[in-house]
Curated annotation (Swiss-Prot):
SUPFAM superfamilies, sorted: Prokaryotic ribosomal protein L17
Gene coding for it: rplQ
Subunit-structure text: Part of the 50S ribosomal subunit. Contacts protein L32.
PANTHER family with a match to the protein in the record: LARGE RIBOSOMAL SUBUNIT PROTEIN BL17M, RIBOSOMAL PROTEIN L17
UniProt entry tagged with the keyword Transmembrane helix: no
Source species of the chain: Francisella tularensis subsp. tularensis (strain SCHU S4 / Schu 4)
GO MF, one annotated term: structural constituent of ribosome
Protein name: Large ribosomal subunit protein bL17
GO cellular component: cytosolic large ribosomal subunit
C-alpha cells in the first residue's frame, strides 16, 4: 500500500530522479522561470523552497553578525556547502545566496509560483511554468510608434 509515501517516481530510478531534480533546481535558480510538466513542477517546488530558505538564513546572519567574524564565516560556509551538496553548481549557489537571500528576506515561504500552460503536443502531458515570485521583469525591446 502507498500510505504516507512522499514524492513521485516518474518512472525513473532514484539516481536518475535525483540527477533530474538537481539539474532542474539549478536551471530554475539560474533562469528563474522554466517550463516542465505539471507533476515535475509540483515536486520541484518542494525541493527549491528549502534551498531559498538556506539563502535567507545566511542573509539574516549577515545582518546580525559582523561579516569578518569567525562565527559568521563558519555558518555561512556551512549553509553554502549544504546548498552546493545538492545543486553541484557554483553559479547557481552564488546566485542563490547573493540575490535570493535579500530578495526573499521578508517573505515567509511561497517563493515559487506554478502556472499551468496547456498540454504538450506529442503526448498531451499537462505542462506548467514554474517561476520564482518577485523576479525582475525583463523589458523587451519593443518598437512602439
Amino acid at each position: 500500500m502507498r500510505h504516507r509515501k512522499q514524492g513521485r517516481k516518474f518512472g525513473r530510478t532514484s539516481s536518475h530522479r535525483k540527477a533530474m531534480f538537481k539539474n532542474m533546481s539549478a536551471s530554475l535558480i539560474n533562469h528563474e522561470l522554466i517550463k516542465t510538466t505539471l507533476p515535475k513542477a509540483k515536486e520541484l517546488r518542494a525541493i527549491v523552497e528549502p534551498l531559498v530558505t538556506l539563502a535567507k538564513r545566511e542573509h539574516k546572519l549577515r545582518q546580525e553578525l559582523d561579516t569578518n567574524s569567525n562565527e559568521f564565516k563558519a555558518q555561512s560556509v556551512a549553509l553554502r556547502r549544504q546548498a552546493f551538496d545538492f545543486l553541484r553548481n557554483k553559479a547557481a549557489v552564488t546566485k542563490l545566496f547573493e540575490e535570493f537571500g535579500a530578495r526573499y528576506a521578508e517573505r515567509a515561504g511561497g517563493y515559487t509560483r506554478i502556472l499551468k500552460c496547456g498540454y504538450r503536443f506529442g503526448d498531451k502531458a499537462p505542462m506548467a511554468f514554474i517561476e520564482l515570485v518577485d523576479r525582475p521583469q525583463v523589458e523587451e525591446a519593443a518598437d512602439e510608434e
